Amino acid sequence: MSRLRTVSGKRLEDLLAAAPDALEADREMRGQIQKGIGARWYAMIGVGVASLLRCERFVYDLRGPLEKSFAVQLAADWTKLSLTDEERAILSYTEKGTLDEASVRRRDVEPLRQAGLADKDILLIAAAIAYHNYLIRLAAAFDVMPS
């Protein structure tokens, strides 16, 4: 049960159902991001953010299509994984956008461009990072599982 008396479930969707417009907005945002960047990158960002925020208990729930062992390794130290240039750039940007978002500058986007990502992709990646930070922090605050 969440920390809200009116919410009996253990998932973020149960919590957001207390404010139906919030639930609808959350589903729409998540759907647009996943559609834009794909399930793998979306899940990698989610696992990365969970790990960076020290919410490892959410890694399994956020791993989506990722193999369990891959998600665990990603959460432990993604720099040791065999990743594409795009994935490395995305996870590096995820770190900066999660741990020190106020210091993100134009130069921090360059590795994403060098990896071949277009501005639309970069915008959606930034949205995914922000979304997962919101999702995980809200879930942790109310003791529910993110999605």
Residues covered by each model-derived region:
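Hydrophobic alpha-helical segments
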Residues: M1-S147
